[in-house]
Amino acid sequence: MQMRPELLLPEILVFLGGLVVLLGGSFLPRDRQWIARAAAALALLGAATAAALAMAGPAQSAFSGTFTVDTATGTARVITALTTLLVLGVASGEIAGSPRESDTYALLLLATTGVMVLAGSTDLLVLIVGFLLASIPLYGIVGLTGGRAGAEAAMKTYLMGALSGILLMLGVTVLYALAGGTDYALLQETLPAAPDADVGAGVLGVL
């Protein structure tokens, strides 16, 4: 089995950065939360750099072909990391010194990891993992606004996310039953021979 976890270095950097910010921020006083922001920015810059360097080489696959690193993946990784870095810069003025400042940065990094996984996935199961990792932290970010309005918004976001997740997994189940696998290449090869209505239902659920 071809694992090659080093190909996921940008995702690993962002994920570890999120964990460091989440755990380390709990021990930082409110007036030193900028350290968590700096750590998050460094993780994003490191991920963008690693993704840009990976684009210089040929297309490669990891984890038995379920994740592909190519120009499209690299471009999405760089854009995602730099966009999140921009969000950190814009949001820092609003949340600087707040009790949940480091938590917000950590959740943003975890959500960013999910988006980057989505960009490189070549298997529906990896797509599900990326979707969950990208969406679940958003519930916390919405809820961190506090108060009754924040709780209501977090609940609505959770319900919409849960519904989307159920439809996604239902669509994946249908496509797996039709194709006998979840690999994108296998789906492209076998689905043209499957009933159009069934394929449409599966694709609609995934989308």
Describe the residue ranges of each PLM region.
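Alpha-helical transmembrane segments of multi-pass membrane proteins predominantly involved
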Residues: M1-L207
